[in-house]
């Protein structure tokens, strides 16, 4: 059973999300501020976090940054329509997705299940590669063991979020091929690409920071201006 940590200072929202998720067979943990969220994540196995942006004390943006220092579990931000800048900031610091309030229960469940599929496919709870998957991908100093879901760069293991891993996997499997931002979004997020350029760019920037010696002058993930991104053969 997957465990979802719900964090929002509005107790009615937490209660509603608890009902939606419990009805789908998920276990839940409930927090009402950012600090309580961090404490629960530290002391309990958690598979996904639903995290409100606007909270007193430690808000969702700062909580996301602190969570990303230790954990790779998917984080879905809960936002208001007026918080567009915060959505971008949240994605910049490591959130995987966001849901705009007021939300539809069906959308919440669909997004939670989508993120969990990615997480478990990358070796999260009950996860792991299938026996028929290509076990090892290499390019220059990058070694990607897709069976163990481990990435090393120049012999050092790097920690990637599920979305970063899947972007890298797509590019590593197709060295030299140019993918548009729309193609990357649709193949990795499994959703239609609607205004996804900034979302993809943010995740690729984070990925470069983890695998490139000089992210400003990347050796591996190259931009092809006006077309998209490719994995340079090294």
Where do the language-model regions lie?
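Short, Lys/Arg-enriched segments at the junction into DNA-binding effector domains
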Residues: 3, 114-178, 182
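Active-site residues of response regulator receiver
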Residues: 8, 52, 79
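Short hydrophobic/Thr-rich beta-strand motif most characteristic of the beta2 strand and flanking loop
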Residues: 25-32, 40
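Acidic catalytic/metal-coordinating carboxylates
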Residues: 32-36, 59-62
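Active-site beta3 strand of CheY-like receiver
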Residues: 44-50
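Receiver (REC) domain active-site loop signature in two-component systems and cognate sites
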Residues: 55
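Basic, amphipathic DNA-recognition helix from helix-turn-helix-like DNA-binding domains
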Residues: 65, 69, 74-138
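Positively charged, aromatic-enriched patches within helix-turn-helix-type DNA-binding elements
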Residues: 150-220, 224-227
């Amino acid at each position: 059973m997957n465990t979802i940590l719900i964090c929002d200072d509005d107790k009615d929202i937490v209660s509603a999300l608890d009902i939606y998720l419990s009805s789908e067979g998920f276990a839940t943990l409930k927090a009402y501020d950012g600090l309580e969220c961090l404490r629960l994540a530290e002391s309990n196995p958690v598979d996904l976090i639903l995290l409100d942006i606007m909270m007193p004390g430690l808000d969702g943006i700062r909580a996301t940054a602190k969570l990303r220092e230790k954990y790779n579990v998917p984080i879905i931000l809960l936002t208001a329509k007026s918080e567009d800048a915060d959505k971008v900031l949240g994605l910049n610091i490591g959130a995987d997705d966001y849901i705009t309030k007021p939300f539809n229960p069906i959308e919440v469940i669909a997004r939670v299940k989508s993120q969990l599929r990615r997480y478990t496919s990358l070796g999260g709870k009950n996860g792991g590669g299938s026996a028929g998957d290509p076990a090892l991908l290499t390019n220059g100093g990058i070694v990607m063991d897709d069976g163990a879901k481990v990435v090393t760069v120049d012999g050092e293991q790097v920690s990637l979020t599920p979305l970063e891993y899947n972007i890298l996997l797509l590019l590593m499997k197709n060295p030299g091929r140019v993918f548009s931002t729309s193609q990357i979004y649709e193949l990795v997020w499994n959703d239609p690409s609607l205004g996804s350029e900034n979302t993809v760019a943010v995740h690729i920037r984070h990925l470069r920071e983890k695998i490139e010696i000089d992210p400003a002058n990347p050796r591996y993930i190259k931009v092809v201006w006006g077309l998209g991104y490719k994995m340079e053969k090294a």
